[in-house]
Curated annotation (Swiss-Prot):
Protein name as annotated: Methionine import ATP-binding protein MetN 2
Catalytic class of the enzyme: translocase
UniProt record similarity statement: Belongs to the ABC transporter superfamily. Methionine importer (TC 3.A.1.24) family.
ABC transporter domain segment(s): 41-280
Annotated compartments: Cell inner membrane
Gene Ontology cellular component list: plasma membrane
Its membrane topology: Peripheral membrane protein
Role this protein plays: Part of the ABC transporter complex MetNIQ involved in methionine import. Responsible for energy coupling to the transport system.
Amino acid sequence: MAQLLDSPGFIERSAAVPHKAAAAPATRDAAAPAAVPGAAVSFELVGKVFDGPRGPAAALREVTLDIARGGVFGVIGRSGAGKSTLLRLVNGLERPTSGAVRVNGVDVGTLDERGLVALRRRIGMVFQHFNLLSAKTVAQNIGLPLKIAGVPKAERARKVDALLDLVGLAAKRDAYPASLSGGQKQRVGIARALVHDPALLLCDEATSALDPETTQSILALLADINRRLGLTIMLITHEMEVIRAVCDTVAVVEQGEVVETGPVWRVFGDPRHGATRALLRTLVHDLPADLAARVRPLDGAAPLPCGAQLLLDVRYTGASGGEPDLGALTAALARNVGDAVHFVHGGLDRIQGRVQGRLVIAASLAARGAAGPDRIAAALAAARRHANRVEVLGYV
């Protein structure tokens, strides 16, 4: 895909559409057109089948998705799940075998070559590998699509300068790609993707080749571009950290199917599919191995021995929207089950303004003797008044 979009042939076909002068990014906020009702991108029962050496292979199966205008929509899944195929359907590099893909209400599958060129002029593309021309400067790399499209030199210069300011590379205008860091190269790629003032920006694993610190800076840039320009971003990744940092909504793709979708806070706080839970495993506060090895399961109606600590798994999903009152939680547990209540593991995070996470709490039962089912039930009832979900892990 990168080679096709960056090839001279692709740029020349794009240039076949008459050039329309565009405002510089700095003025886009004030001059942005009124929002158009409906989704920016919609997939309606989309299937895609490729011919393979062993026969037909389904890459996508009955995918139905709406991507809201002006948002940042993340698509996540394992390698080979079908994420990049979704992206290729949006810009017409692939045609669906069944169903329809619509961009701003236009069925991409019905467009002829000229229609596809016009569509791609309104879609920016950011790649995992930067695909910069080594013999051209930063400014020349950014301005090349405009030059081929016949944009006058003075206008090209104004547009390139505005984009360099937008991505924080004004001082690198005359530098060559060999002198740039990975993050700087990706900033050039982002600026180049914005030269035609696209309404939609597609990002295909745009940070997977970068170190963690640089990744965060690129994600911050994408979020800033989304806010300042109001364009829709569709972002493909296999990293949940990327989704958490920048996306409003996420779809989880597994073996060609969308198995879960929703606001990022909901999918992270209350994952409903096994594939989602597997992808989130690196972000979940699992019990340390030494503590997990000591946990003993409850034995039906048998009381816990004197001196045991009841372990409660307390979850905040963000559904309530408020701030958790940890003081009230521990006080309620102390009143109902024991003299000493303390946190042994976990942590809380804030996603889209909602607090969520996991806390493992130990309630010591020594002072009141053995604890039977009634006291354990009281502990659960007390904790559930202050959290979204509470379960007993066992005791130590």
